[in-house]
Amino acid sequence: MNASENYFTMDPTENISQVLDQNRNNTNSLRTHPTVEEYYENMTAFLSLAIFIASLLTILNISIFATTVSRLRRHLDKPLLGPSIMMVGLYPIISVAALVTILVPYSWFICHTVMHVMFMVGGPVFRTLLFRYVGSEQNYVKETAGEAVQLNTPPCCCCCLCLPMVIPTKAKLCISRYMVWQMPFWQGSIMLVMNILYYRDIQLYRQVMFFFIPFIVCSIVLGAWSLQITVRMITKVRGDYQLRKKMFCLQLVVMLCKLQYLVLYDQLDGIKMGGEYPINHTVYKQTIINILILVEMVLVSMMVQSAYRTPVQVQIDEVNKEKEVTRI
């Protein structure tokens, strides 16, 4: 009996199981990340060029950060200096995470978590910076004399139209603070669990990952809503500090590193790239996405540099005016 006769005499269920196993193996070979040794032993010209470009973009981003920090240290007061440096430092950290993902593809989920953490950390720091622009929460309440604030701001501008205007008090500002500070604790715990599942049991991770998404989305929406309300409050007092531009730069972390990442991760599956394991489709796909993020982080860093010129420039103008008055 030859091989063809053996094939036709096999149980049909065995044929189906073999086909399914083969398809599963093909899928795994496309999705599996290579080890560091396999990655560099099979390096291609495209990946070498990508690493070179990614390194240059990361160095450029760090240079922009150093220039911005140098300017801030010369002109900002100490209460504003720390939070301002932390805010402009989010973007070079994201660039380093994207570079590490290209250098070590297997570390992509940890690096993606680092990008996510930047928004979780940036939210509370930015809120602290906002109230330091006016001294403190108590000073804001005194300075505005109980002026009411609207709650229908993005991302809840449509569903909160029925909510009345609120007069800021110590208790209500405390609630706003908790809405922002829940992000690092709540999302940090979820991302820690997801990292453990991904690197310990990836099959279990793929089964349960969708159950975590609603909790992460709700946490981000609550934090962003509270920050938008706070920006609107402080803008009435410090309208020349470009607070909306600073908030937009922070939101770009989520938009570019989270939403864009997830969208492109699925969309690029329709384009055939790479070959068989180890330099497979997933490696090419992640390299392209992270190169795009690196380019965007350079542009965002330039925008951040422009946004954080104030209150530096405002303080310089005030000093110049005082000098002119004393001369007169």
Swiss-Prot record:
Any transmembrane segments, and where? 45-65, 85-105, 107-127, 178-198, 209-229, 248-265, 288-308
Q: Which residues are glycosylated?
A: 2, 15, 25, 42, 280
Family per similarity comment: Belongs to the OST-alpha family.
Could you state one GO cellular component term attached to this entry? plasma membrane
Membrane topology per record? Multi-pass membrane protein
In terms of InterPro entries, this protein maps to: Ostalpha/TMEM184C
Q: Please report the name of this protein according to its UniProt entry.
A: Organic solute transporter alpha-like protein
Keyword Cell inner membrane among record annotations:
no
**One Pfam family cited in the UniProt record for this chain:** Solute_trans_a
Instruction: List residues in topological domain: Cytoplasmic.
Output: 66-84, 128-177, 230-247, 309-328
Keywords of the record, alphabetical order, are: Cell membrane, Glycoprotein, Membrane, Transmembrane, Transmembrane helix, Transport
User: Which purpose does this protein serve, as stated in its record?
Assistant: Probable transporter.
- Give the Extracellular membrane side ranges: 1-44, 106, 199-208, 266-287
Q: Print the organism lineage.
A: Eukaryota, Metazoa, Ecdysozoa, Arthropoda, Hexapoda
Which compartments is it annotated to reside in? Cell membrane
The residues forming the signal peptide are: none
What superkingdom does the record give? Eukaryota
